[in-house]
Amino acid sequence: PTWALNLFDLLIDLYNEPNMHEGQWGYGTVHHVAFRVSDDEHQRAILQRLRDAGHDVTTMKDRNYFHSLYFRDPNGVNFEIATDPPGFLHDESVDELGTTLMLPPFLQDRRDEVEAQLADISV
């Protein structure tokens, strides 16, 4: 059996085995598949198509650099619909991109904890 999803004028056809056990999270598994859309208006149109087709879709999540919606396929894989705006240049210039760790506002108070988990990278 297959599960078809028509988004962005692109047909996504996935194999669905209803009696198979859902996989476990860990190394080598897919956490989510993200699709890019041009803006919030395009995202709202896709949200409506998904809901009209009976899918359970999250409300819009503001990820500081983009806006996201999430839903799952019958196998439990999480799909994301993410907008281009506001983009990565809304809080730093092209010349500064990647020179510091930029965190969304909700993680700023945990900066030390987040940075302590990152491995040093030399370029």
PLM segments and residue spans:
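Conserved S-adenosyl-L-methionine
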Residues: 58-62
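Short acidic/glycine-enriched loop/turn segments that link adjacent beta-strands
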Residues: 63-67
